[in-house]
Amino acid sequence: MGDIYTGIDLGTNSIKIVVTEKVNDKYYVLASISSPSNGIKNGFIEDSKAASSSIKKALRQASDRLGVKITKVIACVPPSNCKMDIVLGSTSVIDYNGITGEDVSNALLDSLKGQDFTNDELVTAMPISFTIDDSNVTKDPKGMKGSLLETRVVISTMEKGALYRILETLKLSGVETVDIAFTSTGDYFAIKNKKYDELVGAIINIGEQSTNISIFNKGIQIKNGTLPVGSVNVDKDITYVFKAKPSEAREMKENFAMALANYADSNDKWEITIDKDTKKEVHQLGVSKIVEARVREILKLAKNEIKNLTNREIRYIIITGGLSELAGFNYLVEQEFGFVAKVCDITNMGIRHNKYSSCYGITKYFDDKLALRDKHYKMISDDDRESMLVIDSNVTKETMFNKVFGHFDGNN
């Protein structure tokens, strides 16, 4: 059996939960949920009671699919107004025969000494590099020999009050938060590879009411910007122009419109309800023109924000978020950014939708964090893990992924 992790992303429109199992360095999705949310705006808690009720409902659905109750989560938190700084830490190596995960942890803890956390709380501490005895530089020093281990670390923080409201609401919902990371961190780990780990790039996540732009240097976030525009603005445009209900506007956007109007069919029609006595047909071309105009504006604003955040050469741009699933979205991205940009492509069975990028990636981040420190953490008890197994005397199954395959439904 592999290590099992649960990630949760509290969005304005929906709560996403993804449960993964790591087996032989591969991550398999055991359960995924996208459930309507209330009391949450841009990842922040506005009404803890309403938010808790929504979270409980999502947790019940995820637990039902998993077959055991979820009691521990890794939580995505919004990077809006986050602060980042580079700090230094060091430690004497415990055993000269080889650096251990404990030495790594001690060096990272030392880097936090003397930092002012009066108003802000630590979210992540991402090591840039480790130096052994002032000479050897590496990203993972475990097993190497030396007497002094030093590290350069990017620490990120967010305002305490906002973070504590998120943690308190999750606790009220019946789960323990074992770790936190920014949604942008989850997005990066969802697409992380050796190539991106050596480059400077940007990730654009188009959310419900805001768009987040994150700059990464060799796999570590160094800058962040947030725009007050998102997917809901597309809905509002459709509602205004065609006098459609908000729910119908969203449905047209997701299931009818093209992101690039050139690919729309002028003969394809969609019937909307104006009032109880009046219905109206709208053409795909007309709806797509409205959608394209707003999405193009969001992409242009994001491009300008990238320039404002850094003057470094951007070697890759990844666009994610639910809006990036629009038909033809990749063609619009190519027009605005060129070949340096592409749409996030999550191919894992069970989460083939970009709305899951943050909470899927955060489980990979947590596992990576543990591996560097040579630690393990059980989010599900041994008894619960055993209860998840489906006994089949005729077929040998290597992972829980196979055993809970039947829990998947319309999330693919």
Explain the meaning of each model-derived region.
Residues K303-I317, L326-K342, L372:
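ATP-binding/phosphotransfer module of carbohydrate and carboxylate kinases, centering on a glycine-rich
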Residues P78, M158, M258-L260, I314-V333:
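Glycine-rich phosphate-binding loops at beta-strand->alpha-helix junctions
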Residues I17, A75, L170, N205, ...:
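Residue-level signature of catalytic and energy-coupling elements of molecular machines
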Residues M1-S14, V18-V73, V77-A202, K245-P246, ...:
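Nucleotide/phosphate-binding catalytic cleft detector across ATP-hydrolyzing
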Residues K194-A261, D265:
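Acidic, glycine-rich loop-and-beta core segments that form the ion-binding/anion-interacting portion
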Residues A58-T71, L299, K303-Y316:
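Phosphate/pyrophosphate-binding loops at sites that engage ATP/ADP/AMP, CoA/4′-phosphopantetheine
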Residues D345-L389:
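Glycine-rich phosphate-binding/hydrolytic loop that grips phosphoryl groups
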Residues L148-E150, N217-Q221, L309-Y316:
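Short, surface-exposed connector motifs at secondary-structure boundaries
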